[in-house]
């Protein structure tokens, strides 16, 4: 495996909402339907949104594209495996660009503290 891209993003949690009241308009733009369901049920929705936002920003930075030019927030979904670790799942133009570049694996690390959420994404080729 070789590293094809590395991206990191940090988000100031308070920019996405106050207390337990998140910016729902932003959440609907950023989150996939499955993530939206989790967001609505989450005890700390602002933190949930901040971590998903950071992970998706880190992913597009790793790919070197940013959001736009055919790539949507909806093309990146953060899921948790059976051990609770986050995993990235790609669709649409993001998945097509990964395939075209020979990217076969992604690794994501997400963390949050009192004021910030941070994520790092590594994209790998065979």
Curated annotation (Swiss-Prot):
Its main location: cytoplasm. It comes from the Bacteria. InterPro entries: 4-PPantetheinyl_Trfase_dom (IPR008278), 4-PPantetheinyl_Trfase_dom_sf (IPR037143), ACPS (IPR002582), Ppantetheine-prot_Trfase_dom (IPR004568). Its EC number is 2.7.8.7. Pfam families: ACPS. Mg(2+) binds at residues 9, 57. Its cofactor is Mg(2+). One of its GO terms (molecular function) is holo-[acyl-carrier-protein] synthase activity. It catalyses: apo-[ACP] + CoA = holo-[ACP] + adenosine 3',5'-bisphosphate + H(+). The keyword Cytoplasm applies. The keyword Secreted does not apply. Transfers the 4'-phosphopantetheine moiety from coenzyme A to a Ser of acyl-carrier-protein. Belongs to the P-Pant transferase superfamily. AcpS family. This is Holo-[acyl-carrier-protein] synthase. It comes from Alteromonas mediterranea (strain DSM 17117 / CIP 110805 / LMG 28347 / Deep ecotype). The lineage of its organism: Bacteria, Pseudomonadati, Pseudomonadota, Gammaproteobacteria, Alteromonadales. The gene is acpS.
